[in-house]
Amino acid sequence: MKNSSILFVLIIVVFLISSSGNKKMVGEAKKCDQTWTCEGEDKCREKCLTLHNGVGVCDLYTAPLVPKQCFCHYDC
């Protein structure tokens, strides 16, 4: 009896932990992104904030002959 109750509690705890990460709040904004050629870290941040009220970051590493890109992440 004791073993079955411990097993039952363990199963409930595992279920609660695994399902808690899948919940999405009602009305939560969808995440969108947009890219353009990076003209500098400051300009990237400023343009993203102005256009989309988001966060802009330039590439850290790029392939040769490929221009750096500004990645703008914002709520749709």
UniProtKB/Swiss-Prot annotation:
This is Putative defensin-like protein 184. Pfam families: AtDEF-like (PF25052). The gene is LCR18. Disulfide bonds join 32-76, 38-58, 44-70, 48-72. The lineage of its organism: Eukaryota, Viridiplantae, Streptophyta, Embryophyta, Tracheophyta. It comes from Arabidopsis thaliana. Belongs to the DEFL family. Residues 1-21 form the signal peptide. GO terms for biological process: defense response to fungus; killing of cells of another organism. GO terms for cellular component: extracellular region. Keywords: Antimicrobial, Disulfide bond, Fungicide, Plant defense, Secreted, Signal. It is found in: Secreted.
